[in-house]
Structure formats: C-alpha cells, structure tokens
Amino acid sequence: MDKSKRLLLIVGTAWMIDALDVAILSFMMPLIKTEWTLNETQLGLVGAMTSFGMLIGALLCGKLSDRFGRKKILMGTLILFSLSNLALVFAPNVNWFMAIRFITGIGLGGELPVAAALIADRYTGTKRSQMLVLSDSFWAYGWILASLIAFFVIPHFGWRIAALLTAVLALYVFVLRKHLPDDAITHKQNTASFRQLFSPKHKWPLIMLSLVWFIVMLTYYGIFLWLPSVLVLRGFSIVHSLGYTLAMSIAQLPGYYLAAHLLAKMNPKKLLIGYLMGTILASLIFGLANNVTIILIAGAALSFFDLGAWGILIALTPSLFPHAIRGTAMGSAQAVGRLGAVIGPFLAGWLLDIKVGIGGVFS
C-alpha cells in the first residue's frame, strides 16, 4: 500500500468514527424521547447540545493543532469523545445526557478540522482536493456502520449498549499513535494568531466560507439528526425507520466519489453550487413525499447531494490558507458552521412541536 492510500485509510477511519458517533445520536433520539417523555423541542435541544460542543471543539482544537501539532490533538479528540460515550451509558436523565453529549461534541468537532489540516499539509492542488474529499467519504461509512448498529443492536439491547460500543472505539487511538505519520511540518515555532487570520488577504475568504459552512451545517444537522425520528412521525416503525435510514445513508458514497472525480475537471466553486442546488431540491421533495418509494428516492438524493457538498467544502477550505493558520482557519470556519448545527436540530424540533409539519420543516 502506498503512502497516500495508507494515510487515507488511517485518517479516514478516524473520520468514520467521528461520523458514527454523530449518527448514532440520531438513532438514539426516538428511544430517549419515549424513555424520558420528551417533546420535539426538548429532543431538538439534545441534538443542539452536541453541536454546541462541536462548535467549541472546532474553534479550540484547530488553533491548538497549529501550535502543538496535528497528530497530538487528533489523538486527544478521539480519546475525549470516546470516553465521554462511556459516561453516556450511565446517564440517569436527559439533563445528564445533554451535558455528556456537550463534552462528546468538543471532541467530535475538534477532530474534523484537525484531520483536514493534517491531510492538506501533505498535498497540493488537485491531489489535495481529492484526498480531502476521499477522507470525508469515510463519513458515509460511519453513517452506514451506525445504521447497522442501530438496526441490529438498538431494537434488541437498547441505546445504552450502542453508546458502549462507540466508547470501545477509543482503542483506535493506539493505531493512530503507532501508524499515523508525524506532522509534515514542525509546529514548535508556530505562533499564528487570529490577527493573521483576519488580515486583508484572508478575511474575505474566511467570511464567505464560514457563511457557506453555516448553511451546509444548518441543513445537514437539521435534517439528518431528525431523519429516523421524522420517519417514525410518518408512521413507520422504529425498525423500518432504521432500515430506511441505512438505505439512504449508502447513497452518500457515490455523492462523495463523483465529487472527488469532478474536482479534477471542474471549478470547485461551481461544483459546490450544483451540489447545493441538488440538496435544496431533494429536501423539498422529501418533505412533501407521501409514499415509501418517493421518500426513499428523495432521501437517497438528499444524502448524495448534501454529503457531496460537504466533501467539496472540506477540500476547498484549507486550500485557501497557508500552513501557519490552516488549522485555525479550518476550525474557525467550521465553528461558525456549528452555529448552524446548533440551530438546525433545535429549529426542526420547535417547528415540529408547533405543528408546522414535516413538509414545512424540510422546505
């Protein structure tokens, strides 16, 4: 296996674990709603707390990785969110659940910008873009794995055992320690500041990227954290909703792979716009669909376009900033995006609570 494929597998697996943890929450939500008698607004707050932690993690860990190195901080984020999942197994009520998920979110949100910066440090041009999109494609594998756990474990053993399984993934840190290469560029003398980030050269790219990240995360977390719950609200059983979500999740993979292929042939900004338009159209159709076939097709299209757009954005963001502030820039842009991730789940829950309807939420 050549060095690029080896690095892709190592970093991509860490990315997959991050996605698994985010996804598994969406499958827990219908169960904790019943267990603790929550309404939709309260359930939306559960999702929002994880996203708020991810906001803090993205902002903090991106900066720390510029100062202390990508590898160390990446390992630290994995340990943090995996061990907090162990604590989640013993959560006695929803307040404890939300507090623990906030801590989990710090690790989850910190890992992604650090992993992206680690890849971006080693490549340039089209190769960098393709490596970043392919790394992000492991997010789909995380969702698929979470869907399988949800389908085969949660209905029979409950959500706490699912949380325990995610905690075991902390052991992957030993793989990172042994096999992840040391940082491509030394960080010992790096004293990059936010002042550099907001210099005339970097300010406007940061602002525009942050705005796009906000929109993408608002829609992604507002939709996908609620996906199994929305299917239950449509009248499907828990088991059927989990199975349908698994089918929709598989569609993320071709979305990523096509984006990686097209990045070598098209302007990434135009490609991103195309994927975002596809996301909007698929979301509208999904919200208005009233039979299983259309729900599955629209849901698959939504997965295809939304996650493909995410991959393109992952590739575009670090390419616009120099190494010295790359982690800080990536973390800052994603932190603004995480505001959308905080608002999205809560807003969706509130809209459902005031009887706007599923079509209104997805439009």
Question: What are these regions, as identified by a protein language model?
Answer:
Residues 37, 69, 90-96, 124, ...:
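Helix-breaking motifs and short loop linkers at transmembrane-helix boundaries and internal kinks
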Residues 56-94:
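Conserved MFS/SLC helix-loop-helix module at the cytosolic interface between two early adjacent transmembrane helices
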Residues 58-69, 255-267, 352:
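Helix-to-loop junctions at the C-terminal end of transmembrane segments
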